């Protein structure tokens, strides 16, 4: 918001305010109660209080906020800060000390655009002054989306003073310089195995912002159901569980817009040629036969016309540069078992494996024609890696050592190795999520640059709207710090961050996120009465 009319006396440049030296001892780091841990932090020992009419000021910013993204983010930040208690104290009185009253936040953004581009600058610099300094905190960022991250960090500095019943910031002055380690920090949700209503998906998106995750991988369809409306082929959503468990095209556009305004990309996935039985509920011609319904019919041009129609429709609303085409767990026996397709294979002198390659590469060409770069699951690389389009990103989920091989071949990679980053593995504790290193055994800088980041996967076979949040959180937060915080700042022993993660879990609870206890694996119940800090 430009030109609020507020005057800011003596706001100092961020670099002049930055105190030399950063937090290094883990004992001190654990006192910070910030998650994920910023790149550089220094603080003092004073306190300030938030004014009752805490303001957003944008004088000097090139970003005009015509779309309201910054103002909405500021309002959300204040909302969660004030959510945990009723603020009944006089937040503007001398009782809090006039010089200790923080009047607002001065945000300066150097880019005038709010286009959400993959790889855009997400850095920010945050200064909260001491009581003797200017009465405005200052946040600088290259992009509005970096500023949103800064707002999240600012919200974690705010605490409720039980005696004065106002919001305070302890340990001022604060000086934080921060940016993400990886550009891709993802969370997968699966709406085929169990339908997730729109409010649930929006709640997941909101919770992602608290941990600075930035990609929602929407595994929309699979064998079990096809819940999304595709205007080009309107019978496809006949594969939904019921008419009430569907997403209209406008619903999908709303999810994309909701996420975008929070700095989150939406990666859409259609998993082909396997995992696609539900497609044939509306168009049986997509099946090899009525008795052999998966994978999709490789011999039929109609199959690829449908894929083209889906991706054409996707391109109207899913604006992320990538689309996910799956390609995993393809059992090709139906092709040889169906006489018509077996004859086609013979005519084209293809084995089942060669037909699998043909299908994946043809689907890739269709995606490229609609302006997308492609992500495929790792089986495509294992089976015919040298044939993949060079714009392919290989999504690792099976083999821990695959990332090294993918990057050595010159292809990009996303890490989701199931032994550590699959959230549906209920017995997997948060420590494994924290310790999982995307650069494991990769020391070459060029190969490291090809690792885009990582993603935790919330597969939907055994979760629905009733338990998705406590299955995701707090374990996803452990991975989020791995993907955000500089490697040198990460704890070598995950147990060293237990106190800070417990505070973040309590913070999620206070913000209405049903994050489970840390003790045990995922989705565990509290083992006895007690504080959320101890569980």
Curated annotation (Swiss-Prot):
Glycans are attached at residues 92, 331, 405, 441, 496. The gene is HEXO3. N-glycosylated. It comes from Arabidopsis thaliana. Slightly inhibited by N-acetylcastanospermine. Expressed in roots, leaves, stems, flowers and siliques. It is found in: Cell membrane. The lineage of its organism: Eukaryota, Viridiplantae, Streptophyta, Embryophyta, Tracheophyta. This is Beta-hexosaminidase 3. The keyword rRNA-binding does not apply. Belongs to the glycosyl hydrolase 20 family. Optimum pH is 4-5.
